[in-house]
Amino acid sequence: MKVSLVKEQTVRNYANKHAEARASCVDFINRIKTADWEKPNNIKATFGSVDLLGKGTYRAVFDIGGNNHRFICKYRFGKRSVRLYVLWLGTHAEYTVLCDKEQQYTADNHEKYI
């Protein structure tokens, strides 16, 4: 199924604030635009370095820019398409702090980049 990236502009704004991640952010967007997913494991086929979080969160953590940045997105598989919602964007160091506090399951900072 076709994948739609919700809040694509948020990723672009993040890239503008983190120039070193710009090319990787564009690559992330382009991969999403050409993705064809039927189930969550297909996300791993598109992005080899992605972690699917458990606990019924329907969240995926994407490694961006050589593992220097992380994006947390929520995925929703519908009848005809998949929607990928950008929830959290940050550096690897910020993500580590998030995980130390076990907040990766609930984190949401995308408004910072709107």
What are these regions (language model features)?
Residues 1-68, 77-83, 92-114:
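Basic, Lys/Arg-enriched alpha-helical interface segments
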